[in-house]
UniProtKB/Swiss-Prot annotation:
Pfam families: Aminotran_5, GcvP2_C. PANTHER family: GLYCINE DEHYDROGENASE (DECARBOXYLATING), MITOCHONDRIAL, GLYCINE DEHYDROGENASE, DECARBOXYLATING. One of its GO terms (cellular component) is cytosol. It is an enzyme of class 1 (oxidoreductase). This is Probable glycine dehydrogenase (decarboxylating) subunit 2. Its cofactor is pyridoxal 5'-phosphate. The glycine cleavage system catalyzes the degradation of glycine. The P protein binds the alpha-amino group of glycine through its pyridoxal phosphate cofactor; CO(2) is released and the remaining methylamine moiety is then transferred to the lipoamide cofactor of the H protein. The gene is gcvPB. It comes from the Bacteria. Keywords: Oxidoreductase, Pyridoxal phosphate. InterPro entries: Aminotrans_V_dom, GcvPB, GDC-P_C, GDC_P, PyrdxlP-dep_Trfase, PyrdxlP-dep_Trfase_major, PyrdxlP-dep_Trfase_small. GO terms for molecular function: glycine binding; glycine dehydrogenase (decarboxylating) activity; pyridoxal phosphate binding. It catalyses: N(6)-[(R)-lipoyl]-L-lysyl-[glycine-cleavage complex H protein] + glycine + H(+) = N(6)-[(R)-S(8)-aminomethyldihydrolipoyl]-L-lysyl-[glycine-cleavage complex H protein] + CO2.
Amino acid sequence: MLIFELSKTGRQAKAQIPRAVSKNYSIPEEFQRKSPPRLPACSELQVVRHFTCLSQKNFSIDTNFYPLGSCTMKYNPRGVHKAASLPGFINRHPLAMDNESQGFLETLYKLQNYISEITGMPGVSLTPMAGSQGEFAGVAMIKAYHQSRGDTARDEILIPDAAHGTNPASAVMCGFKVVEIATAPDGDIDLDELKRKVGPRTAGIMLTNPSTLGLFMRQIKEIASLVHQAGGLLYYDGANLNAILGKVRPGDMGFDVMHLNLHKTFATPHGGGGPGAGPVAVGKRLIPYMPLPVVKKTDSGYHWATRQDYPQSIGRLSCFMGNAGILLRAYFYMLVLGKEGLLRVSEFATLNANYLLKELTKVGYTAAYPDRRASHEFILTLNSEKKNYDVTAMDFAKRLLDYGVHAPTTYFPLLVPECLLIEPPETESKEELDAFVAVMKIIREEASKQPDILKAAPHTLPVKRLDDVKAARELDLNYFATHE
C-alpha cells in the first residue's frame, strides 16, 4: 500500500525536532509555491508503521546471501563507517581553506598513494562520483591524449562482446565508434579477430580482467603489445579488481588507465542511487589529463592542485571533491586490512568462487567453461534444464527468492545461453556457501518434478513478476497522475 492511500484529511504529525533555521527570513515571491504541497495526511504512528514495514521488505547484504555476479556484494564493515563519520570529516565545509583542511587533505593524499600502489599506476584522481563516471573520465583522457598529439584519426574503441554495458556507452559519449571483438570458445578474446581489427584508427581497447565470464585473460600481455604497437591505449574496467587484489596490478599488465569501483573492491555501500565513487588511476603518459581536483603535497603541507598544475586536464566532474564520505570509507577499509589483508581478500574471493562452482557441478549444474578455473565469479548455463524441464534461468532466479537468497545476475553476459553469473565474495563463510548449494539442489529437483513451482515463483513476496517491458515504456512515478 502506498502512503497516499492512508491519507485522510485532518490527520497530521507534528515535527518533534528543533527548527534548524531562523524564522527571520524571506523567500522571494517568484520562488514561493502557489499551492500547498500534496503531501499525505497521516498520523505519526501511521507514518512510522508504513516505513517500518517497507524496511522489513528490503533485501540487503545485512540480511541474506547476495551472490549477484559482477557486483561484489561484500559486507560493509561498520567500523569504517564510524571512522569516516568523525566530526573533523563530516563537519568540514567543501569550501574550507587548505590550511583548515590539512587532516582531510592528508587522508585523500594517502588514499591516492594507496590506489597508486594497488594498481601499479603513478597518477590518481579521486574526483569521479561513480564507476561509470570514472570510466567516462578514463576514455575522455584517452581522447585528450590522442588529440594533444594531433592524432585525430583515431576514432575507434575496441570492446569485447562480453563487456559491461557501460563500456560502449562511455566510448560513444566520448565520440568514439565501438568495434566489437568476439570471445573465443575457451572464454578468452579471439586474438585473430583482434589482430584484424586493431589499426591506425584504434584509440584504445577496454577490457575487464578477469572478464565478466569470471575468467582471467591469459593473453593480456600479447593483447597489450598488439594495441600499443598500433598506437592505441589500454583501458582497465576495475569492476573485477577484487579477484586480483594484491596478486597482480593492472599497470603491470600493460594498462594505461583504469577506474576503481570502491563499492565493490573496497566495501563502500552499494545502491540507492548514490553516493558513489570511481577514482581513476593512470600511467605516466596520461597524468597531465587527469580530472581535477587532485591533492598535492608541498613543503607547506597538502593542497588542491589547480589548472596551473594540470593545464591539459579534462576538467572537473563535480563541484568539489566527488563524494568524500565514500572515499574516506575506502581509505579506512584499506587501512584496517593493510597489504596482507587486501591480499587475503582476493585469495578468499577466488577460493569461495571455485569451491562453490565445484559443489554446484556435483549436484547437477553445468559450468559454462568447465575447463577453466574461476576467478572471483563463475557462470552456470541452464540450457539443459530449459530443454529438459522447460524452465528458464529466470525461473530459477525467481525461485531462489522464496528461499531467502538474492538471485544471481541473469542473462549476462549475453553470449552464454540461460546463464546465472554467481559471485560469492570473500566475506561469506563455507557454511553459507553450503546452504546455497543445498537450496540450488532442491530447486533443481523441483524443476525436474514440479516445474510449475518455478514458473510461478516467487510465492512468498508481495511483488511477483513485473511486466518489464511495460515498466520501461510506460514509466509512471506520479501517484496523482492516475489517482485524481
